[in-house]
Amino acid sequence: MAAAAGDRASSSGFPGAAAASPEAGGGGGALQGSGAPAAGAGLLRETGSAGRERADWRRQQLRKVRSVELDQLPEQPLFLTASPPCPSTSPSPEPADAAAGASGFQPAAGPPPPGAASRCGSHSAELAAARDSGARSPAGAEPPSAAAPSGREMENKETLKGLHKMDDRPEERMIREKLKATCMPAWKHEWLERRNRRGPVVVKPIPIKGDGSEMSNLAAELQGEGQAGSAAPAPKGRRSPSPGSSPSGRSGKPESPGVRRKRVSPVPFQSGRITPPRRAPSPDGFSPYSPEETSRRVNKVMRARLYLLQQIGPNSFLIGGDSPDNKYRVFIGPQNCSCGRGTFCIHLLFVMLRVFQLEPSDPMLWRKTLKNFEVESLFQKYHSRRSSRIKAPSRNTIQKFVSRMSNCHTLSSSSTSTSSSENSIKDEEEQMCPICLLGMLDEESLTVCEDGCRNKLHHHCMSIWAEECRRNREPLICPLCRSKWRSHDFYSHELSSPVDSPTSLRGVQQPSSPQQPVAGSQRRNQESNFNLTHYGTQQIPPAYKDLAEPWIQAFGMELVGCLFSRNWNVREMALRRLSHDVSGALLLANGESTGTSGGGSGGSLSAGAASGSSQPSISGDVVEAFCSVLSIVCADPVYKVYVAALKTLRAMLVYTPCHSLAERIKLQRLLRPVVDTILVKCADANSRTSQLSISTLLELCKGQAGELAVGREILKAGSIGVGGVDYVLSCILGNQAESNNWQELLGRLCLIDRLLLEISAEFYPHIVSTDVSQAEPVEIRYKKLLSLLAFALQSIDNSHSMVGKLSRRIYLSSARMVTTVPPLFSKLVTMLSASGSSHFARMRRRLMAIADEVEIAEVIQLGSEDTLDGQQDSSQALAPPRYPESSSLEHTAHVEKTGKGLKATRLSASSEDISDRLAGVSVGLPSSATTEQPKPTVQTKGRPHSQCLNSSPLSPPQLMFPAISAPCSSAPSVPAGSVTDASKHRPRAFVPCKIPSASPQTQRKFSLQFQRTCSENRDSEKLSPVFTQSRPPPSSNIHRAKASRPVPGSTSKLGDASKNSMTLDLNSASQCDDSFGSGSNSGSAVIPSEETAFTPAEDKCRLDVNPELNSSIEDLLEASMPSSDTTVTFKSEVAVLSPEKAESDDTYKDDVNHNQKCKEKMEAEEEEALAIAMAMSASQDALPIVPQLQVENGEDIIIIQQDTPETLPGHTKANEPYREDTEWLKGQQIGLGAFSSCYQAQDVGTGTLMAVKQVTYVRNTSSEQEEVVEALREEIRMMSHLNHPNIIRMLGATCEKSNYNLFIEWMAGASVAHLLSKYGAFKESVVINYTEQLLRGLSYLHENQIIHRDVKGANLLIDSTGQRLRIADFGAAARLASKGTGAGEFQGQLLGTIAFMAPEVLRGQQYGRSCDVWSVGCAIIEMACAKPPWNAEKHSNHLALIFKIASATTAPSIPSHLSPGLRDVALRCLELQPQDRPPSRELLKHPVFRTTW
């Protein structure tokens, strides 16, 4: 490097430099031993001899360098001493050395900028070398040390003299102009950066070795830190061709800047005095955070998912986030943001760092305000960069793009190091997404503007931009060149990578498969309803690539990609779209195939197995792909997505025909994975999800009678369904879940538990009423039951506690249900014995205890081992169909008598003995020798439902309800002896309560009462009698912890869980006998009925008696009854779009009725007020008639006069002339517009006073004239059809010569604006009167699909009485294309007075009727304070006012003296969001207009 310096120095013409170069080259960059002393000696001699000549030369050189090179000031280094090894080390003090040494103090006047070495030849290079060698000489070298201070002082003085002479030189003007774009000198910038990063600098003398190795090491280190690795000898002093190389040498050793700053201290001060800028830079500029926090914030901004949506003002941007609702306005200059998070928020830093591309160390980044020239400079650079990308790309750019597309992973490492600065900058720009302002990597999903600038963008960023365009109702355009995007489908130009699919989106969207025209066409037709394009293309995980291929073929890449989105909203929308597409495809396929195949197998899913047409094949493939999708999406953890998946499942099933057995088999096979997924969801931790899953499968069990009936929505489908209960049972039992997969087991067990309760007729035929037809033999039904119990028996020993306990509970509760069929009960005991379970002994004890309860223990012990089939007849005989009014004791006696001929006298045994024995069984007391057991639980709280299953038949429910003998008068009598026996005793387990027991009659009364309470929609006569041996209620919520008390009102919901099913009344008895009977909760409760509910206070007194039993009862209650109003069913969540849950709480109903009445009353009052307003609107004064302006029906309202040229066809020819100054006279001017004038006029023939609006239609070009004529005709014809008391009326219109004359009725009171200027602000009563009339007129216009768009005081006319207001001047009015309020066809048109215009109009967004409502609020402000809103009279610059309103975050200030009512009206009108403003018709219902002022 030093050799190169020597060569370059010798070419400059200095002999000393040429003489020094050989030593420099031979030394290889290392100083010789005597180099430093020799340089110091030469420096001392030259200082005394040739000072004046050198000073003159320095001044000339300084002028030259500064005048030419100060444009490099932002890149100039802090100190020049960071050069590489000094090239000049001559052993003898030659004149060249001396000259170099004397000039070594040149930096005292100011450091040469980078590039000075190349322009000044070797002299400046040796200056630095000699200066370094002299400055760093050892302490022992006295002559150089003594000479150094004197030389510096001399240089300082002479430099100052030269600087004073530069003040009036023309170079100074150039320097100032060069400094306009700079804000802070680079030395100060670097100094601040180093100070923040390294803290205070401690200056220490650095001893330099005699051989100069310290300086060599320093230079080498500096060189190593540089970004450009070229072989230049002085990276700090050369002029680099790359802009990135100038800051590369600004970092050196931590201690070196301190030393140099001390020795060359005049540098910053002198440089500051050389070129004082004409405009000082903005103040501050220091980061308010610590260096670490500053770095963290900058890094956060560089990674933030923010997007530049558009520039919405001269100095403002609209910044968006991933969510379409997150938009923020960033204002440059004031440096603030609409997010309200204070200065230097992430959005402002995003604009500064990524939009303006400032360096993180740029002081402008941390300024709280920027001056105008700084803002202009930033925007100028931004727009120049942006416009450079819009220009047509060069051939080289296109070739590079093509090469990158074809070979993305073969980037050469050397290709980035050999490019010029301009090409590198442009290449960097091309590799940056213009929306997120981040680089585009090869592995990212990219798209390209194909019809415009051909710039690449991120797919995700483009989807954000597409959503913005969609919300603004704009066509999708390129955010750079504004050219129209080819399609709403974003074509994937992503480069091939292991993650991406090789098939592009465009290829997928083409109808390459026979399924595409069916599903794809439906999807495209309904794109407006279920538009997914604005979500962009979502990446499909690699694990699902192969699985998703048939999905893509059937439904398209766009929809399938959204199913894998990380945003649950996108997934939900995709499922809604999928539901729509599939139902449409199935309808289309079914409709076309039924005509060809004749119905038998037409439209089937068997892919042509039953029919040879292609249409069934299409629908079959769609269903197959659809079921595959559902098997995955039904596992979604988000509840709303899961609901959407079930809705999609229903949509598919109800439109899928199934006529043959083959079709049923195929449909069963396709649905099997879906059902398996839902089975797992039955044990979901989310209670709503588990309830909904169980309810869904119950609907499937109902077959063609349920909500999931196959082909339900197809007319005359005649589908046979998928099999109902049998199919669900096959799904439960078919795939035997592994024992380690506890979720699958628990989900199946939860469903089994619910099935046995909800559709008990399928499993317990002995308790079904005789009038219920039995489709299947009893044997088959019992086999179903046994298969389920065998499945539960397999899981009794499961390691997962919840699985094992629920299995045991199901088994025991089913055993209790079949006690009336002793052979079946015996079969259960046998199955338990054969299982070899570790719980065998305990389970058998509990089974025998159940047998003892119902007095069939002897039957079991006598060896009733007959097979189930052999005992069916006796089983039927043992189970009478119904016992509507028999007590539990009587029924037990009946079973005993008819079953095995047991003695009826057995009933006379002491009830105390039975109660004591079975209470111990039920409670599981430690003192009970027969029922000793731990405290297992099915729920997480650790309490088993099974502990409640074995309640004593005689354990009195009266324990909880002591006063229930009176209410029930319809209960039949029972034997007195039974009553006496039961009433004498109480179970030993409940002695501390001291509450007398209840009689069986009382028990039965309570049971019947409770039955009426719980059975909302059931016919109690069809239900079985109240069994004392009862199974527990369902446990769909078995997996989650419950509240410690029953929820008030929960009993009234009991029937909901078992609606439309053969729910046994023993369910009620299980609550009565087991839950309340076994000494459970409270001794002070009342009978549950429709008017009463359980409260925590009622069961509190029994809590400490037996917490085990209390907990079990509580679990039974909560498992059997919905604990609150949030019960989730398939019908409430899926089948009905807007579910209305039946409420049985009378208090709630009363509240609802009361509120409903209040609401109805208020609505009636509003409607009455509106009727009055409309009635007042109907009162219309007579309009004077001018004969010459009348036209026949069907003729054009515009009458063309005779002397008018025939250039305007379509008008009515005048039968009678009506010319100015002849038939009518023009009076004083009352208004003036750009192309129109308004005058008072009088009809000569009738004397009618009129106002005439004369509009000239002549323009410079014919096309412009045609537009004007068409607009005038539209205005005239519009006004001719308007007839309302608050709308100005037109008498007629003529076309005469070059003018259109619009004759309108005369309003003598002039305009509201004129009255305000003449009389001042109105009183509030007047404001309310005028506002109401204004709203009436606007309501009439809006109902006729007209928006005025120019509502202001100048266009509101008052009649001669001052009481009637009419809306005038429809020059800006336009007719809406539809009757929808949100029509937005007038985007970008700035019509009307600015101060009264809505922000969305000024922003160029879509607008509709709501813009007139905003103007009403502005008119209220104008009438209340006689000034337009926004202090518009103080704004002489219309653009500034537009910007103020368009960027406003609050409504204009409302006068404080307004009453609350009128203030509320104004605030409603001035809602910033158009959709939040009420329609004018709704505002008329406001109470302020119903009050007499």
Curated annotation (Swiss-Prot):
Q: Cite the record's tissue specificity text.
A: Most highly expressed in spleen, kidney and lung.
- Residues with the N-acetylalanine modification: A2
**Family annotation (SMART domains):** S_TKc
Q: Where does this protein have compositionally biased stretches of type Basic and acidic residues?
A: 152-171
Bias (Low complexity): 1-23, 33-42, 95-108, 135-151, 230-257, 507-522
| Activation/inhibition comment | Activated by autophosphorylation on Thr-1381 and Thr-1393 following oligomerization.
Q: Which cofactor does it need?
A: Mg(2+)
What gene is this protein a product of? Map3k1
Which segments carry the region annotation Disordered? 1-171, 222-295, 496-524, 866-910, 923-955, 992-1060
Sorted alphabetically, which InterPro entries does this protein's record hold?
ARM-like (IPR011989), ARM-type_fold (IPR016024), Kinase-like_dom_sf (IPR011009), Prot_kinase_dom (IPR000719), Protein_kinase_ATP_BS (IPR017441), Ser/Thr_kinase_AS (IPR008271), Znf_RING (IPR001841), Znf_RING/FYVE/PHD (IPR013083)
Q: What is this protein called?
A: Mitogen-activated protein kinase kinase kinase 1
State the oligomer form and interacting partners: Binds both upstream activators and downstream substrates in multimolecular complexes through its N-terminus. Oligomerizes after binding MAP4K2 or TRAF2. Interacts (via the kinase catalytic domain) with STK38. Interacts with GRIPAP1.
SUPFAM superfamilies reported in the protein's UniProt record: ARM repeat (SSF48371), Protein kinase-like (PK-like) (SSF56112), RING/U-box (SSF57850)
Output the Pfam families linked to this UniProt entry: CEP104-like_TOG, Pkinase, SWIM
**Phosphothreonine is carried by which residues?**
T275, T1381, T1393
Species of origin? Rattus norvegicus (Rat)
An example Gene Ontology molecular-function term: protein serine/threonine kinase activity
Q: What is the effect of changing T1393A?
A: Loss of kinase activity and activation by autophosphorylation
Location in or out of the cell: Membrane
Which residues are recorded as binding ATP? I1230, G1231, L1232, G1233, A1234, F1235, S1236, S1237, C1238, K1253
Polar residues bias: start-end ranges: 496-506, 925-940, 998-1014, 1049-1060
Q: Where is the Protein kinase domain?
A: 1224-1489
In this UniProt entry, the residues modified to Phosphoserine are S21, S137, S265, S282, S287, S290, S497, S521, S910, S999, S1024
* Pro residues biased stretches: 84-94
